[in-house]
Amino acid sequence: MRVSSIEAEMENPIDVDKTDVEGELKIKQVTLLRENIVKKIVFFLVAIFCSDRPSVLKKVFYEEVSKQEEATHVYVLASDLTDYIEEASLKENPEEGGEKSIYFVNRLQKYIYHKKQNKFRAIEYFIQGKSYSEIANNKPLATGRVDQLLAYYGKSEIEINVPSFLTLMWREFKKPINFLLYFGIIVWGIEQMYVSTAITVVFTTTINSLICIYIRGVMQKLKDACLNNTSVIVQRHNGQGYQEITVASNMIAPGDIVLFKREVTLPFDCVILEGSCQVTEANITGENVAIGKCQIPTDHHNDIFKYESSKSHTLFQGTQLMKIEDDILKVIVVRTGFGSYKGQIIRALLYPKPFNKKFQQQAVKLTILMATLLLIGFLSTLSRLLDIELPPLFIAFRFLDILIYSAPPGMPMLIAITNFVGLKRLKNNQILGQDPNSASQAGRIQTLCFDKTGTLTEDKVDLIGYQLKGQNQTFDKIQCQDPNNISIEHKLFSICHEVTKINNKLLGDLMDVKMAEFSTLDIDYDHEAKQHYSKSGNKRFYCIQVNQFHSEYQSMSVVCKEVDMITKEFKHYFFIKGSPEKIQSLSHVQSSEKAQLSTLINEGYRILGFGYKEIPQSEIDAFLDLSREQQEANVQSLGFLIYKNNLKPDTQEVIKEFKEACYNIKVISGDNPITTLKISQELEIVNRKNPTVIINFEETENVKSHLIITEIQPDNSTQVIDFSSAQNEQDYINKQMSYCCDAFLNNKSFCFSGKAHYYFQLKAKTDHISFKPEWVKMQDKSVQKIISFYQMLIINTNVFARTQPEQKQTIVRLLKESDQIVCMVGDGANDCSAIREADVGISFAEADGQFSSSYVSLSTSLSCVKRVLLEGRVNLSNSVEIFKGYLQVALLRYLGFLTLAYFYSSYSSGQMDWQALASGYFLVYLILGCNTPLKKLEKSVFDDNLFSIYNVTSVLFGFTLHILSIVGCVESLHASPIYKEVNSLDAENNFQFETQHNTVLNFNILINFFYVIISNHIGKPMKDRYYKNTIAIYYDLGLIYTCKCMILQVLLILEHTHHGLIFLILLLDQEFSSSLTVQVYFSLPMNLFLPEEFSLNFTQEVKKEKELLICNSSSTILEVDYNLRLNYFQQNF
């Protein structure tokens, strides 16, 4: 073993090479760091507080180094601009002759430094770029070599470490937001408010425990879904020769040659060396259909292996091996663990994209504003506190309370628990939520993007029949023919697919199965020739080569060998089927054929074109060696297959409700523009009474290509808009942009094709244009105009057709960049990347494909989207409600503290407990989590911007009202004949708790709690009315009864009472221990609560101090002597 020389200095930061094992979680740069242990020991609290701020930790506790042996950690900057600090070590790099290189793990993916390229690179088995012949010539690994590879690549398993409950609790408790809580607990402890401290600790621990239990449950479920420990047969070299041994699947290393002899769930990604099979990739794509896989073509020895173009030869981890066509399937393992395709999906789930923190950022700013107001209040009373010689420690407490009450630490926990309750409600409705952060985000959704097939429409399709080109007759069945002389289209229907027969049942893509059934020919497999075939009479039609369907080609094709089993004569055909536009582009099409296609599409059918060409016997070997593009050139179009794809039963009703609620609805489909438009018109997403503009593109050789803009009238007549008068390319773009702007203003609908996306992608490549927001303003005006044109089309278009998976992701990303909150709904197949890109993703797939989405519906009904949106509105409104209410209550309590300190008093520990627990700014907001969503979506104009005029005004109004109520209570008390003044602290130089100020302000706060809860409540259109929350109503009634406010019994009108406003004072026996003596209720205008004849009496000022008005249960008014008052209260309280 050779040891590397690692003394050479390295540049910081170091770039990271792209690989095929990172998936979406890529990293850009790595910086070598050395940890300063002394600083971490001295400033360990800072290290904990900044644990989620790697950039801060880097500056404080680490220093950059340029030598590998000096580095203890690395600073990682990811492609999504998140950053991490990871531990680093030296590891042998077998790709560089065993030299030691610096190595680290980021988000479960291993990276190692490559000296030759001066780049870091994710650890992967090198196969991409190798020729098929090189791969086919791989030999079994030596037994000793396997152990080295396992140490380098890791075990072949997706091992998800479910953190222990205590580990998760520690993560929760060390979040920076909780440090305010700890600060508050320390202050409360010094102030000897032990019960209040205990209540806070218990509630915090309980809420965090529930959250941690939920997280563990989700992770355990994911871990169970990833477990796939099985036994496999592997070929190894033991020094004397090759042998077949059975080992556990997790002990397989990349490069191992494995033999499959039975059906199994694949535990790794592998490439087929020998044999063919049928698999279902439902665990990956969400589509439970049989897919044929075959061995790599050994006769194409110079062809290069690429994962994207070699899917027909690649088996992915998690797929189910349904049928092995021959006795054995020989494969070479290429990707394992989190580097496999499934592993990449799981990594993306475990490390989701950073969510929008706008609400949190606004909350911090509003908290600072409130803290400023409290500081002003504190400073305004400071001179008084100093004049009465209040001990400095007490003044310090009041100052420190600013931090506690302006940024209540329990607030994030309350918001989290309401989100948790929302997820549980969704689970009861067969909707699984993966990310609690998306619970409130669903309430902000503005734009809904839907895949068409399987989402808006049913998964199943019906084959109506077919038409031959130039004929308008639709054949709903194959015409009777001589079985030994069937038509060319009959041959094509029977073999141009990847359908297989398992247990006498045809399995495969639904459209392929329908076509194969339509052909009526028997389908089988020839074990000797190792080929699928169909048969009719004496003829067999063998499939000798398959070009699988790919979104880039929009077609699938086969090379067919027709054999007469009696005469042994044979012919060769090339059959192709796919999008009709694709087939027409490959053949010479007459205008009549285009009109025929247009007629079929306008009837709303889903159309496949099909064609063929016969291959001369002398050319067949050369033809098989041609590329796919060359094989598909110059085919002869035959006609069209006609399918009908019906809407789901509830689609129309649900979409109508979305439209009435003013959501921006977009359909993003891979189907052709006209079919997608017809579905959109049927759902009234597009107004069929208005013209529709289709944006398309056709690349033409030797001619400068531009967008093709076609306008379709309501009567289905079409017109290609002519821009030939443009003087140059920029003028051409300006004219097209001007036309589109006018079309938008005239309420014309737009359909944007995938080829139009390709036009802008081509523009970006040839003209060096960047569509990234941070680069837009740095480019010249002509370029900015193109970017604006593209963005304008994406934002204003409602129908996207012939869209490839990566284009769907681009659409969602551009919508997000235009400040829209986007929800993507798909079936989990070609929509995974777009679903993950969206702010909220919803999938219908009951498979591992579901893990790309925030929510997974176990039913196929579109109503699940409605439920998610309704629940999101509840969570969002609860979050705003809790934030505003919790903050107002905290401010109210702090103002009470300041006021009481002004009069040598403070709240007792018991009163603090009562305020915090029974009166409920804690319990009540927990109960608010039980607010239920509405039954129907309504138009919402809810603004969760905490700095909106309404929200700021309501908070400031509440703040003002609280101050006025405190002033009113104190002034009323001072004017009362029973007022007793307190002029000093108690004998032990502590606050006095048994004072009238204490009781008055305590009851004032309790009553104001109800005002805060009710005034901040957000009902329709976000959630049900407050009175429909049964638990909250009963709880409130219980508090009212406890406070003796259920029945108004005594009203005392004081001299200074303003007309129309009353103070309701309930007197209690002063000997009632240290409890409450006077309750003051500052109400709204009394005529809202009392009959008119009473209002007339109450608005008169009563100047006799000993006159008392008692309103009993029979609503009669009595005048009694003041002495009777105490007797009355002694009997009734």
UniProtKB/Swiss-Prot annotation:
Ranges in the topological domain labelled Cytoplasmic: 1-6, 54-167, 213-363, 419-887, 932-948, 1019-1030, 1125-1133
Subcellular locations according to the entry: Membrane
Topological domains, Extracellular: 29-34, 191-193, 384-396, 907-915, 973-994, 1051-1101
Assigned EC number: 7.2.2.-
Keyword list, A-Z: ATP-binding, Magnesium, Membrane, Metal-binding, Nucleotide-binding, Phosphoprotein, Translocase, Transmembrane, Transmembrane helix
Record: active site: D451
Coiled-coil annotated residue ranges, if any: none
Catalysed reactions, as listed in the record: ATP + H2O = ADP + phosphate + H(+)
Record-listed Mg(2+) binding positions: D827, D831
Entry's Gene Ontology molecular function annotations: ATP binding; ATP hydrolysis activity; ATPase-coupled monoatomic cation transmembrane transporter activity; metal ion binding; P-type transmembrane transporter activity
TM regions (residue ranges): 7-28, 35-53, 168-190, 194-212, 364-383, 397-418, 888-906, 916-931, 949-972, 995-1018, 1031-1050, 1102-1124
Primary gene name: TPA9
Keyword Kinase attributed: no
Database matches in CDD domains: P-type_ATPase_cation
Name this protein carries in UniProt: Probable cation-transporting ATPase 9
InterPro entries the UniProt entry points to: ATPase_P-typ_cyto_dom_N (IPR023299), ATPase_P-typ_P_site (IPR018303), ATPase_P-typ_TM_dom_sf (IPR023298), ATPase_P-typ_transduc_dom_A_sf (IPR008250), HAD-like_sf (IPR036412), HAD_sf (IPR023214), P-type_TPase_V (IPR006544), P_typ_ATPase (IPR001757)
Protein family: Belongs to the cation transport ATPase (P-type) (TC 3.A.3) family. Type V subfamily.
Gene Ontology CC, one term: membrane
Cited NCBIfam families: ATPase_P-type, P-ATPase-V
Membrane topology: Multi-pass membrane protein
